[in-house]
Regions:
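Metallocofactor- and cofactor-centric catalytic cores in central/energy metabolism, strongly enriched
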Residues: 1, 148-160, 173-225
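Acidic/glycine-enriched connector segments
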Residues: 1-53
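Short, solvent-exposed amphipathic alpha-helical segments in soluble enzyme
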Residues: 2-3, 66-71, 98-101, 134-135, ...
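Glycine-rich phosphate/pyrophosphate-binding loop at beta-loop-alpha junctions
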Residues: 2-5, 12-20, 24-27, 69-73, ...
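Short acidic-hydrophobic, aromatic-tinged amphipathic segments that line or gate anion-handling sites
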Residues: 30-39, 115-126
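Active-site/ligand-binding-proximal alpha/beta "capping" segment
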Residues: 33-82
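Conserved thiamine diphosphate
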Residues: 42-53, 102-121
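PLP-dependent amino-acid enzyme catalytic core
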Residues: 119-143, 155-165, 172
Length: 225
């Protein structure tokens, strides 16, 4: 059901054995039909602010791994990926076990990559994972080798110092600093009021960058102080 018909748009794939979209969006003008999986995946990754994966077949695996791969390699911006099971279900639990026992054990992914997704069978926990991701963090973009992380609230000086101490390895050179918007962001004037933290990013280990975002979201703000 998602956000309901009024606040949703659908990305349907034309298959010979599934002729219609789900009932909550079927027949709506905002339902987009695709002939190819790759264009459908491109659209949902580009437009999504979060993704929730439910138990499914090869198509579900394809889409989950596509989103994870694009985020892990920096080809898409980080956003919450929640793998939600029915209460007491084991679908994603055993999926994660496979990832751990094979991909991670063989060194094909890093332990930090596990920060890029959340496995749960609790709907409220899934909702919290998405909502809390945007508690202080707003968005980010790159200007040259600098990453500009936009914040809904400015951080305290102590919080910025703590980020520098804990996440120095993601910084290519210099330090993490808090500042106002850059001139290069003038194409996004609607968010120029937001505070930023800026640093030269190594552009690798995006699981660690996700951990930095998580740390930002539990940081002390300047207002709170």
């Amino acid at each position: 059901e998602g956000a309901g018909r009024q606040d949703s748009f659908g990305l349907n794939i034309a298959l010979p054995f599934e002729s219609t979209a789900n009932s909550f969006i079927a027949g709506d003008a905002k339902l987009i039909n695709f002939n190819y999986f790759f264009t459908r995946k491109l659209s949902f990754v580009k437009e999504a602010d979060a993704a929730v994966g439910l138990p499914g077949g090869f198509g579900t695996m394809d889409e989950v791994f596509e989103a994870l791969t694009l985020i892990q390699t920096g080809k898409a911006s980080i956003y919450p990926i929640v793998l939600l099971d029915a209460e007491g279900g084991t679908y994603w639990k055993f999926w994660k076990q496979f990832i751990d026992e094979h991909l991670a054990r063989l060194g094909l992914i890093s332990q930090n990559d596990f920060s890029l997704f959340k496995v749960t069978d609790d709907v409220e926990e899934a909702v919290s994972e998405v909502v809390n991701f945007y508690r202080i963090f707003h968005s980010y973009r790159y200007v040259g080798d600098q990453i500009i992380i936009r914040l809904n609230e400015a951080l305290s000086e102590e919080a910025v110092a703590s980020l520098n101490e804990e996440f120095s390895e993601v910084v290519k050179s210099g330090t993490i600093v808090q500042q106002s918007c850059l001139e290069e962001e003038d194409d996004e004037s609607e968010i120029d009021r937001l505070s930023r933290i800026v640093f030269r990013h190594r552009r690798r280990d995006f699981g660690r960058l996700r951990q930095l975002i998580d740390a930002v979201n539990v940081s002390e703000t300047a207002v709170a102080k």
